[in-house]
Structures are given as C-alpha cells and as structure tokens.
Amino acid sequence: MRNWLLPEYIADILPATARQVESAKAAMLEGFRVAGYELVLPPLIEYIDSLVSEGDDTLDLKTFKLDDQLSGRQLGLRADITPQVARIDAHLLGERTGVTRLCYAGSVVHSRPSGLTSSREPLQVGAELYGYAGIEADQEIIELMLATLEKAGVKKLRLDVGHIAIYRGLAAAAGLSPEVSRELFGLLQNKDAAGIAARVAGVAEPYKSAFLALPELYGPAAVLEKARTRLPSLPEVELGLMQLSAIARAMEGRVELSFDLAELRGDFYHTGLMFAAYAPGWSDAIARGGRYDNVGRRFGRARPATGFSLDLRDLLRILPERDPSRGIRVSARHLPAAAAEVSRLRAEGEMVVVDYLGESAAALNCDRELVPAADGWQLAPFH
C-alpha cells in the first residue's frame, strides 16, 4: 500500500510550519487592513474563460482543467488569484467609481512547478489597488510590499524595477507581429542574447539597436539616463522612463534599488511598471508586482490597476524558525475539578493541553502545568 504518497511538488504543511504560516498570514492581512485594503475570498474553482484570458498561454498551461458535470462547461482550478480579484472589482463591486483597495490570501494550484524547489500549491497572498492610474498608486503598492516583507522578518531587501510598456512601445513602433513580439518577449525574459540578435536581425533601425540594448540597460538609477540616449524617443519610452525616475526618487535611501529594462518576468496581463523584491542569498524573487491596467475589461469594466503578490510557502523557507509558544499541561485526573480554571486560562489565550497518558513536556509542547494549591489551582514549571 502506497496510498499515503502525494503527487510530485505537493506537500503537507506540518504543525510547526502551519502555525508559522497562519501567524504570518494573519499579520500580513492585518497590515493590509490598516492600509485600507478589504479582504476578498474568491472561489478555488471557476469557469476557465474567467480564469484565463485569450492569448495568455503561460497561465493557460499552469491551470488544471476539468469538466463541470452540472453545466457541461470547462472549469479550472485557479492558478492565479489576480484575475479573480479583477472580476470582483469589475462585476461585483461595479458600483464603486473611486479607488478600490482589495487583498486576498489563498491556495492556488499549478499543473507544473515554476521551479525545482517550488510547490504546485502555492499559498498566494497579495494586495491590489484599482481606479487610479497615477504613479503614486504604484509607489503605495511598492511601499506596502516592502513593509509586508520587513514585518515578516526579511532583512536587507533589494528592489528590482522594470517597465513592460517600454518593450511593447518598441515592438509596436517596429511593426512586429503579435507572434514575433511574443517570441522576442520570451527571449528577453530568458536573457538570451544570441536569440535576441537572431530574432531582430531583419528589424529596421533604430528599433533593432534598441532591442539589442535592452539587456544591457540594468543597474542603479544612473542607467535611466543611459537609456534615454540609447532608446528612440517614443511616447511609451518617455513615459516609462519618467515613471521609473519617479520610483528612483521615491525609494532613494529606502531600499537597495536597481533597474532592468529587460526585466519582463511578469504576467501576460501586466501593462506598465513591474517590480520584484529579492532577499540576500536567494536568486528567485520573493514577491512580485506591477501595473495591469484594464485587466477587468473582459469582465465589462476597464480600470487602472496595480498590485503585488507573494507565495507564503516560498517566503517561509527563508525566514528563521520561530520558537513556538508553549502550553500548560493539566492532568486528566484533575478534571472536572480544574475545568473552570482551564476555561479561564483558555479565555486569556493560553494553550491548555489535557494529558491522558503522562507524556513528556516535549511531546505535549508544554513548559508549565496546572497543579492543585491550597486556595485552588496554580501554575508550576513542567520539564
């Protein structure tokens, strides 16, 4: 019998880690709440055309699909919560005309892992701001992301920032077909210099040189001035560089900051500023975000939008384990005499564990015990 085995890249979360997960999640959601973000809980399963937009091949491949025996339509297990929140803003909260701030926390399921150490069941936590196109909204989301990570215990963060509209503006001006643009987009994501050179060999100047320059335009804020001299003066390029400069000024001294104009490792729906947070010693981003204006258009309401998300399972791998709180042992033989005192302690937030077998302090996760006293009950050390 091997029915206890789980699928590849799927794992249980055991008690010590589960406590840390729930504690971190609660702290993050509270941080969102005090910043004005309202919690939503989208369903795990939806019709596939709500979860995946046409042309989003990456998300489509990630999404588990099954048939609905009630309607006959195809369903999907969500692989990303952002499209669901966009649907909620566009359809269920459509009466709101101003800024809407929403947050969420829940499991998503991927048909394939995103990396060798990744889970196929990430625990996605995120926050999104709808209804304001100004760079101030992006700054708010970046600040919220950094504060969330710092509160969780991540130190010495690095923030990488890019702008996908710069690439898309160049692709449109160069007259690239959607297929070629998507292929070149993938080559830039993978930093494939030889592939990029081959793909743009027939592209007219100045766009050919611009595409070849993109992978070289990375580094501190000074690289933005270099970009102004190497990229053609297109509206999308000018706006993108202006917004990146605004982020450079806003984040100066706040966090280690770098810019990468070929950093396009976002999602299909991103439209502008993109950013990722990195921790020392880890090559993969621990949180990502960006602008995705008009993501709700297919739900009947196009609005400016920006947000970020993280995988709490991944994040916990880089955080130090916290010493769990210890409980109070009460021997089963003291019940029901001690029942009132046990109830009082639990009401105060103490963990009180009934010991039926005379187990050790380590087994019970207790460092104190409830013992009889002359005037009732008292706590004594338990080793």
Swiss-Prot record:
GO CC list: cytoplasm
GO biological process, one term: L-histidine biosynthetic process
Keyword Amino-acid biosynthesis recorded: yes
Entry's localization field: Cytoplasm
CDD domains assigned: HisRS-like_core (cd00773)
Entry's Gene Ontology molecular function annotations: histidine-tRNA ligase activity
UniProt entry tagged with the keyword 4Fe-4S: no
Gene3D superfamilies, alphabetized: Bira Bifunctional Protein, Domain 2
Pfam family, one: tRNA-synt_His
Domain of life: Bacteria
Cysteines paired by S-S bonds: none
Keywords assigned by UniProt, alphabetized: Amino-acid biosynthesis, Cytoplasm, Histidine biosynthesis
Pathway involvement of the protein, from the record: Amino-acid biosynthesis; L-histidine biosynthesis; L-histidine from 5-phospho-alpha-D-ribose 1-diphosphate: step 1/9
Family per similarity comment: Belongs to the class-II aminoacyl-tRNA synthetase family. HisZ subfamily.
Function summary: Required for the first step of histidine biosynthesis. May allow the feedback regulation of ATP phosphoribosyltransferase activity by histidine.
NCBIfam families, per the entry: PRK12292.1-1 (NF008935), PRK12421.1 (NF009086)
Quaternary structure (record): Heteromultimer composed of HisG and HisZ subunits.
HAMAP family linked: HisZ
Additional comment: This function is generally fulfilled by the C-terminal part of HisG, which is missing in some bacteria such as this one.
Name this protein carries in UniProt: ATP phosphoribosyltransferase regulatory subunit
Naturally occurring in which organism (per UniProt): Chromobacterium violaceum (strain ATCC 12472 / DSM 30191 / JCM 1249 / CCUG 213 / NBRC 12614 / NCIMB 9131 / NCTC 9757 / MK)
Gene name as annotated: hisZ
